[in-house]
Amino acid sequence: MAGKQIAQRPGFLKDFIQNFRLDALCLFDEKRILISQELPTPKQRWAEGHEIGHLIIPWHGPISLGDDKYTLKANCHEAMEAEANLAARRLLFLRDKFKVRALSSEPTLSHVAELKKLFGNTMTTTFYSLVEVLDIPAFGLITDHPKKPGKDFDRFNPCRYFITSPSFDSQFGQITDQQLYAIVEKYCRWGKWDLGATETVLTDNNGERSVFHMETIFNHYDALT
């Protein structure tokens, strides 16, 4: 996002984009969205949807023009980004049409690939959206390739995203992404797509044990489990 001062100073706008390495930028005053051409084409659609989310959520615009004691808090900006992501998912996945399709088949990575083609979004955003709408206990991990993590990999925060279905939250809320990623590291192999699969037993909040099927692929950008 950017405020009025950025829109009125093109030179500053260029420096702003380069210094902060932005993939997308929303100019509220002009109702204009800028997308970096360096961003892979499949991801540009998501970036545009995300910035549209900022535009259509009423309270995001005023915040882009300045900060007060509330908006300076980190959790405020985290909330804004989460809301923009939610808006993007609702726009790009056609609201409840995606949920109907998502629940029409077993929740496998093959099904994710089918939904990706049907709705025209990236594998990663489709995967994220599928896990969220499942009506069974399920989770998803979005990470680096387990066998060749990036330079900024953090052992204590190994997952870029840890997605859970509502029933997983209510029944397995004590399970952490670190625990699950440790399992992924054990079964994953070197590869460019299919990294492996396994079954694991997780204990719920009541002490009952359930078997979960886990599978991981790498789509050149993210490892999806």
Give the positions of each predicted feature.
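Active-site hotspot residues in diverse enzymes, especially metal/ion-binding acidic/histidine motifs
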Residues: 1-225
